[in-house]
């Protein structure tokens, strides 16, 4: 009898999970950022709260950019931009939505990002350019937690640094008409910032758009980021 109850309970939980997935908003489609983001700012338009050491590094990056020197930026060597920078670039991305997994496929080098739904975020993972991401539905919003980032990428196109302690939380909210997507991101990195902070971005859906092939190695000379 206990075994039967356990089986029925598991089946019920599975059905609830499937029903939740079925009721989740459909984020599928190709998305373009609505407004170009250069320097990432907090939601109130301020410079993020950098530590003294990180501020010095940020200033060094901005000085180099002013001189036309982008050699510090791995993107100029065809390395992946990292997050959340990849979400701030003008090139579009496509969301492929499945019951247990979401995929972000970016035009830039066709970079794929996998978000595992309803899984725990590992505390010890090998570093990746796009980190390791898990997600869950909070009512009609998709909440994504990511860690395990390479520390050689940047947070934006203006040289904002981060460390391997970066923890990124993203909250995606779809508009009622399904054509606009709002992203609220929280950046927590105690090695780089004195406190966690939030930023935001908006995206517009482009029905019928097919993302073209994009291979960085085909660029004759990559001396500076495309954005």
Where are these regions (language model features)?
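Positively charged n-region of N-terminal signal peptides that target proteins for export
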Residues: 1-5
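Short helix-onset patch at the extreme N-terminus, typifying the N->h transition
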Residues: 6-8, 29-30
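Bacterial N-terminal signal peptides
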Residues: 7-19
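Hydrophobic small-molecule pocket/channel-lining residues, especially in calycin-type beta-barrels
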Residues: 20-227
């Amino acid at each position: 009898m206990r075994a039967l109850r356990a089986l029925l309970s598991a089946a019920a939980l599975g059905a609830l999970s499937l029903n939740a997935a079925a009721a989740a908003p459909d984020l599928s489609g190709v998305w373009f950022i609505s407004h170009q983001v250069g320097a990432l700012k907090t939601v109130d338009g301020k410079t993020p709260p950098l530590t003294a050491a990180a501020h010095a590094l940020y200033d060094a990056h901005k000085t180099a950019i002013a001189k036309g020197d982008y050699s510090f930026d791995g993107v100029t060597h065809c390395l992946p931009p990292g997050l959340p920078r990849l979400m701030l670039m003008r090139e579009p991305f496509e969301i492929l939505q499945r019951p247990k997994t979401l995929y972000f496929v970016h035009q830039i080098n066709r970079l794929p990002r996998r978000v595992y739904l309803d899984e725990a975020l590992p505390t010890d993972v090998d570093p990746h350019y796009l980190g390791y991401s898990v997600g869950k539905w909070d009512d009609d919003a998709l909440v994504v937690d990511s860690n395990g980032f390479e520390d050689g990428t940047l947070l934006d196109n203006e040289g904002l640094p981060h460390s391997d302690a970066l923890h990124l939380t993203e909250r995606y909210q779809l508009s009622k008409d399904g054509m606009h997507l709002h992203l609220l991101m929280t950046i927590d990195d105690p090695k780089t910032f004195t406190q966690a902070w939030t930023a935001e971005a908006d995206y517009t859906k482009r029905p019928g758009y097919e993302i073209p092939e994009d291979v960085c190695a085909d660029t004759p000379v990559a001396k500076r980021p495309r954005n």
